[in-house]
């Protein structure tokens, strides 16, 4: 793997947020809010079949309804059982990268491990790069792109990008 293969996680032209929400108590709300607050310049596509609009943006019932030919990156924050079918949709749509924030995979035992193996198989067959599952996501302060569900304090833009498997590291960056 080279650094260029990670570019989609930091410099996408568009992002779909599966599990986006208008409910401030949901992680999917905070991901969209962070993208808006950080003034991400790419297109943001909230995906949730329960909504027509999310935080002022048109919402889509599924990834397949998004009018782009390809989607650079999808961040997934839905119950673990739904992730494999979303990954199949990502493969059909030509998604380049996926950040799976959802938990409940191999860290929970046999059933979770089976789910994770299914996700990995789909990703490998489709050539999709994956960060996660059970991750706090990515953050690029220079262009306002993030997939994290944690509150991102306002910061001066600069040449820093961050990818973390554990929230502790990203949280330490936030409070420093």
Regions of interest found by a model, annotated:
Residues 63-68, 81-103:
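Rossmann-fold NAD(P) dinucleotide-binding segment
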Residues 173-176:
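Conserved small/polar residues in nucleotide/adenosyl-binding loops
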Residues 75:
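N-terminal Rossmann-like NAD(P) cofactor-binding module of classical short-chain dehydrogenase/reductase
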Residues 25, 34-54:
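NAD(P)-binding Rossmann-fold cofactor-contacting core
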Residues 45-47, 98-100, 124, 129-134, ...:
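General beta-strand structural signal in soluble alpha/beta enzymes
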Residues 104-126:
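Rossmann-fold NAD(P)-binding glycine/threonine-rich loop
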Residues 1-9, 144-153:
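A short, basic/flexible loop-to-alpha-helix module at the beginning of a structural domain
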Residues 13-31, 161-166:
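Glycine-rich adenosine-cofactor-binding loop
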